[in-house]
UniProtKB/Swiss-Prot annotation:
SUPFAM superfamilies assigned: Nop10-like SnoRNP
Name of the coding gene: nop10
Family designation: Belongs to the NOP10 family.
The protein's name in its UniProt record: Ribosome biogenesis protein Nop10
UniProt-listed PANTHER family: H_ACA RIBONUCLEOPROTEIN COMPLEX SUBUNIT 3, RIBOSOME BIOGENESIS PROTEIN NOP10
InterPro entries recorded: H/ACA_rnp_Nop10, H/ACA_rnp_Nop10_sf, Nop10_arc-typ
GO molecular function: snoRNA binding
Gene Ontology terms describing biological process: pseudouridine synthesis; rRNA processing
Keyword match rRNA processing: yes
Function: Involved in ribosome biogenesis; more specifically in 18S rRNA pseudouridylation and in cleavage of pre-rRNA.
UniProt keywords, alphabetically: Ribonucleoprotein, Ribosome biogenesis, rRNA processing
Length: 59
């Protein structure tokens, strides 16, 4: 069985548990998503980044 290390977004603690042992916050995977040359969600990710940063948006 493979274990994936997780990281607490609140305090930055690394653990193998679902919740942080220090603050009790739900942990997230510390690994990036698998690379794919086709990048099926690339368009959505770039659009969200532009909207979030306000790039190319007329005000």
């Amino acid at each position: 069985m493979r274990f994936k290390i997780k990281k607490c977004p609140k305090c930055g603690e690394y653990t193998l548990k679902e919740t942080c042992p220090l603050c009790g916050e739900k942990t997230k995977l510390a690994h990036p998503p698998k690379f794919s040359p086709e990048d099926p969600y690339g368009e959505y990710r770039r659009r969200l980044k532009k909207e979030t940063l306000g790039i190319g948006v007329k005000k």
